[in-house]
Structure formats: structure tokens, C-alpha cells
Amino acid sequence: MKAKTLLVMLAALVSSPAAAEDFYKDKVVSIVTSTGAGGSYDSMARLFSRHMGRFIPGRPGFVVRNMPGGGNVIATNYMYGVSAKDGLTIATVHNAMPLNQVLGGAGIAYESDKFHWLGSTGPDNSVILVRADAPIRTIQDAMRSEVNLGSTGAGSGLTLLPLAMNRVLGTKFKIIMGYKSSEELNLALDRGEVQARSFGYSSIVSQHPDWLKTRKVRFLAQIGSKRLHDLPDVPLITELATTDEERGILKLISSPPGLGQPYLAPPGTPPDRLAILRRAFEETMKDPAFLKDAAALNLDVDPISAEEITQMILDIIHTAPDIAAKTRVLLNEGGGFSK
């Protein structure tokens, strides 16, 4: 027993910050983001790239790599099966990726519970919004009249949310996919090419405060566990359900916003380097300089720990089979997740 304890102590010494400094010194850590340039995921990743290195022994440099496409699936697959597993690559992937796995999304080659989650910047309700000049003024109007809603790919939460609302609540969103990034989709909304989209509320605050100031958009519904203080009169989609089954399906669909903007390391990352990355991620989110820069960019930070985010993702993955199956069938009938 004493020999075993000694081995554990020696292993701890090998995994010490001093040993890690030998590895990280003069290295560059890549942050892969599953979105294009200009969105809130990209902005937050670039903010981390400027600060996180200060909390890693050896003070490595950081670079952001945008890898959009496939409704965020391309980057997530890359992190699972292709990226280096040496502690020099981390990622922020869209919070719909665990849900996408549960629902059997097209092209998925990852298992969310096999990633090493570092934490998250905090929960963020999504909203369904329309241009203020659209004839649709309430969610009930969207149940009576068709409205063009822009999105990226079939596996994205930007598609899943309105698709689920169409099938469960009877809304008539005509989902137009194919936009390469959130910013490209915003331009389409500005031009009137589409009249509606799903969006993280904090992204609107950080990227388009002018939309709020000039009342360019109107909010029809929000997706999350509780109403935002800023939107007390905008209903949650779960509040619109009329049966327990509908409520269960919409609760599952509403799970991604609670994950916020999660960060991960790929399976196989060495435990000592993973511990350093998790500690650095946590320390960065408490750092006054980081928080000051985040506030200047209108980026909210309400940290979720590695342990918490891991449990939240496991809860999604282990959704009751009947609810997962009904949701999967429902979305397939609606045109999503064809394989």
C-alpha cells in the first residue's frame, strides 16, 4: 500500500506545473471554433486567446481557428477524431452538439460524453426574432402565417429550434438553410432576405445592440429554463406546450442554451495537461482584466465549471429513451436529420 501511495505521489510530481512548463513553453495552443468569424463564439474565443496563456505554465501563445460548416458538425467531428490530442488544441463548439447526437443528426462522428469538457462561459437563452417590419408580431401570428427563417445547416440549433416549434406548436417557419456563418445570416436579415432567425440573446446584445436601440427586431419566443430579466413578457417555448409529451420534447430541445458556450479538449488529451487547461480556463474567467475586456465587448460571463458542464451534457445524452425517440421521429418527419 505504501509503495502504491509513493507511486501516486511520484506521478503527481511528474504532472506538476514545472513539468508542464517544459511542454507549453514556446508552444501555441489552437482554439477551434465551430462558427465563422464575427459571431459571439468567435469573439469569446479571441478574448480567451488574449488572456488564457497567462494562466498556463510556460505562457504559450494562442491562435483561433474558425471551422464553420455542417451545422457546426464539421468542427466537432474534427475535435473528436482528427485533432492533435497533445493538449495544444481546444475548441468551443455550438451548444446544440450534444442534443444533435441524441437526435441522430446527419454526419455525426463524435460522442459528446467522450470529450473532456473544460467549462462554459455561462447559460444564454436563445430567442426567435423577426424583423420589426414583418407582418408577424407574436408567436401566435407565426402559427397562422408563414415567415422565412434563415439558418446554417441541418444539425445546427438554429435549425432544430424552429423545426421543433413547427412540429410541436404548429408554427409556420419556412426554414432557409445554407448560410455559412451567423454574421452572414445577420446580413441576410438586415437585407430582408429572411425575416426571422434563432439567435442567442447575449449575441444580440454584444453584436447588434443597434437592433435593440432602434427596435429593428421583435422577439416572439425564448428558449431556456426561465425567462430572461430583459424579456419578461416573451414566452418560453415550454410554456406554450399543451401536453406533458409536448413539454418533455420542448424541454429537451431547450437544453442547449443552458450549456452556454462550452469549451472542450479532445478525447485522449493527457490528464496532466487537461488539468492545466481546466485550471487555466477557470482562472481566466475570474480574471479582472479578462472580465473588463468581456464587458467592453458586451460579452456576458457567468462561469459553469468543468464538473457542472460535464454533468449537464450527460443529462442530455441520457434523456429518457421515449422522449428522445419521439423527438427524433418528429424532427425527421419535419425534414431534419435525413441520412
Specify the residue positions occupied by each region the protein language model found.
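Hinge/capping helix and adjacent helix->loop/strand transition within the periplasmic-binding protein
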Residues: 23, 29, 54-59, 78-89, ...
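An extracytoplasmic/periplasmic, membrane-proximal ligand-sensing/linker region
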Residues: 25-27, 214-216, 269-339
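Sec-dependent N-terminal signal peptides
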Residues: 5-14
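Ligand-binding clamshell of periplasmic/extracellular solute-binding protein-like
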Residues: 48, 70-73, 87-99, 120-122, ...
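Extracytoplasmic "Venus flytrap"
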Residues: 31-46, 68-71, 150-157
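A ligand-binding cleft/hinge motif common to bilobed small-molecule-binding domains
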Residues: 95-107, 159-168, 196-240
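Short beta-strand and adjacent tight-turn residues that come in two discontinuous sequence segments
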Residues: 92-93, 152, 178-180, 198-200, ...
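N-terminal signal peptide c-region/cleavage motif recognized by signal peptidases
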Residues: 15-19
